[in-house]
Swiss-Prot record:
Protein name stated in the entry: Argininosuccinate lyase
UniProt lineage: Bacteria, Bacillati, Bacillota, Clostridia, Eubacteriales
Protein family per UniProt: Belongs to the lyase 1 family. Argininosuccinate lyase subfamily.
Pathway connected to this protein: Amino-acid biosynthesis; L-arginine biosynthesis; L-arginine from L-ornithine and carbamoyl phosphate: step 3/3
Record localization: Cytoplasm
GO aspect biological process, one term: L-arginine biosynthetic process
UniProtKB keywords: Amino-acid biosynthesis, Arginine biosynthesis, Cytoplasm, Lyase
Length: 465
């Protein structure tokens, strides 16, 4: 059933029907469409726009349809133009002419925006729970590896010794920001648009506040033109999803490197790895590689909607129908990526010895050697130059700094004493960095405590129960 057609003399070309239809995409919003219609029908009755008896017939019919659709008794007719027309035609089939009253004081323009906001609010709640679970996985791994020394990198060159806990907590901070962006997107989505009509509200005495309360919105939108043409909340969500994928992709790239024989820092569980059809020895990090690849897909969803919206005049235009396919694809991709990634991290084995051995190579304690000289009275720039000469000689002689005798060190500066060896021990290098945010046990324990409180705080948020 089409919700329009009275002014047309000819039927729509079948190709146009297929091109125009969105039922394959928006059918996943059937619950939200019915929820919105239930609130709308109740309001129509309360405001005496239709009789309370007729309102009750409509709501009873909608509840029965919802029940039957949930139980697969009613299957969605994919020849319908969209989910809105399908629900209304099904309602009319079940309760007769009364079903034709449902669309009073409503347009598909405000209806589809309502449905999408209802759907997205639920999706954001689920998404935040998925991120919080990943945070819990990182928290537990961080607790286990407070003392697991590894090299920290800049420019993919070994730089300074850190701990695995410190490294994991860096990603925990990224995902904390992601949760903040999800919360912000939720706030912008939590504005009820129904009652805006096609673009200029309605001549009926509707009560938008009643509908907002029934549907759990914190506020109503304040301009009808903006209400039906706004997709900022979708773009904001897609932006947040893109950043989540960027963070997952960065982490995945490191996991891929760490799995190689050249690094051998971690070993992925068999259940999160795949093999080769020709090379029997292979154990491939396909999960991490796919997440890295799917990041571009989510970026594409964001660019799609930004491009769709960039030249649209007020108010609603059919271009906006493209919003849902991009949003749903991104939500599905990020949700599956988060869950799979969390499982991969939770089950992977850490090769502690290899991490420490790698940190011991590459002169990661060179900065600490320079700091030793500074603390003995040298200027930092002079100390930097001295240590640079020491490193150059060590490379030539294939030695580590700690392999040098005190006499050899004194050739570069008489300031060196026996205590230099303790100063450049990797554990000392890590533990001396007690500044908030650093890799020392004291600092990492503080970061872990903050992460625990963050998780506890948001798990207790009533919006997300």
């Amino acid at each position: 059933m089409k919700l329009w057609g009275g002014r047309f003399k000819k039927g729509t070309d079948e190709l146009v029907n297929d091109f125009n239809s969105s039922i394959n995409i928006d059918s996943r919003m059937y619950k939200e469409d019915i929820e919105g219609s239930l609130a709308h029908a109740s309001m129509l009755g309360e405001q005496n726009i239709i009789s309370k008896e007729d309102s009750l017939k409509i709501t009873s019919g909608l509840l029965e349809i919802l029940k039957r659709m949930d139980n697969d008794v009613i299957n969605i007719d994919l020849t319908s133009e969209d989910i809105h027309s399908f629900v209304e035609s099904t309602l009319t089939y079940y309760i007769g002419e009364y079903g034709k009253m449902l669309h009073t004081a409503r347009s598909r323009n405000d209806q589809v925006t309502l449905d999408l906001k209802l759907y997205l609010k639920k999706a954001l709640v689920k998404l935040r729970k998925d991120i919080l679970y990943l945070e819990e996985v990182l928290l537990e791994k961080s607790k286990e590896h407070i003392s697991t020394i590894m090299p920290g990198y800049t420019h993919m060159q070994k730089a300074q010794p850190i701990t695995l806990s410190h490294h994991l907590l860096a990603y925990a901070e990224m995902f904390k920001r992601d949760i903040g962006r999800i919360n912000d997107a939720y706030k912008r989505t939590d504005e009820m648009p129904l009652g805006s009509g096609a673009l200029a509200t309605s001549t009926y005495p509707i009560d938008r506040y009643m509908v907002a309360k029934d549907l759990g919105f914190s506020k109503i939108t304040l301009n009808s033109l903006d209400s039906v043409s706004d997709r900022d909340y979708v773009i904001e969500t897609l932006s947040a999803l893109s950043l989540i994928m960027m963070h997952l992709s960065r982490f995945s790239e490191e996991i891929i490197l760490w799995c190689t024989g050249e690094f051998n820092f971690v070993e992925l569980d068999d259940s999160y790895s795949t093999g080769s059809s020709i090379m029997p020895q292979k154990k491939n990090p396909d999960v991490a590689e796919l997440i890295r690849g799917k990041t571009g897909r989510v970026y594409g969803d964001l660019i799609t909607l930004l491009t769709v919206m960039k030249g649209i005049p007020l108010a609603y235009n059919k271009d906006m129908q493209e919003d849902k396919e991009a949003l749903f694809d991104a939500l599905d991709t990020v949700t599956l990526s988060l869950k799979t990634f969390a499982g991969m991290i939770k089950t992977m084995k850490i090769n502690k010895d290899n991490m420490k051995k790698s940190a011991a190579l590459g002169f990661t304690n060179a900065t600490d050697l320079a700091d030793y000289l500074v603390k003995k009275g040298s200027y930092f720039r002079d100390a930097h130059g001295i240590v640079g000469q020491i490193v150059l000689q060590c490379i030539k002689d294939n030695k580590m700094i700690e392999d040098l005798t005190l006499a050899e060190l004194k050739e570069y500066s008489p300031t060196f004493e026996e205590d230099v060896y303790d100063a450049i021990n990797l554990y000392t290098c890590v533990e001396e960095r007690k500044v908030i945010g650093g890799p020392s046990r004291e600092s990492v324990k503080f970061q872990i405590k903050e992460l625990q409180e963050f998780i506890h705080q948001f798990k207790g948020d009533e919006i997300y129960d």
